[in-house]
Amino acid sequence: MKLTATILSAGLWLGVAAAQQPVVAPKTAPATHVTKDQIQEFFAKLPPGRILDSPIRVVDVGGYKVGVYAVTRPKDSPQDAIYHDTNMTEILYMLEGSANLITGGTIPDGRPPARPGGNFTGTKIDGGTSRHVVPGDVIITPGRTPHLWANIESDMTYLVFRPDPDGTQQLR
């Protein structure tokens, strides 16, 4: 019995050792580095007082694209509910400012996009969930999820990371 257990144990370890193989990186860029200085310089070049959503970098990561965007949203800017008809998730990292972000629910007065590939918009969201967002917070909004900024307390700047399985973003 002891010999059988020893043989089985040795066979198990040999199988594990044989299954281990070197990991080879795919033939894509190993990583993309966007530095703090690059981000700050990018924001500094944006014109003040406007809603802007501008790509800092968009890269192909092997089968899909990922974008890093700089967003500015002045306190007194008009706010629309928005719905992106895409699988692209938005991961928001708030840098400055605070407001409530309403996600989910429905846009009862939704207007179709003004151009192909554009967004559905409206004036409000019914049945959504409101969250107070402050600097340092992260919000993950799946594609095809209505969202709306409300009660903006101060000018906002934030980063949005957009994994794009449909490949709709332009490389930058």
Map each language-model feature to its residues.
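Bacterial N-terminal signal peptides
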Residues: 5-17
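Alpha/beta-hydrolase fold active-site loops
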Residues: 89
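Structured binding elements
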Residues: 92
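A cytosolic small-molecule/anion-sensing beta-strand core signal
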Residues: 95
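Short beta-strand segments in beta-sandwich/barrel cores
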Residues: 98-101
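Short acidic-glycine-tyrosine-enriched beta hairpin
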Residues: 106-143
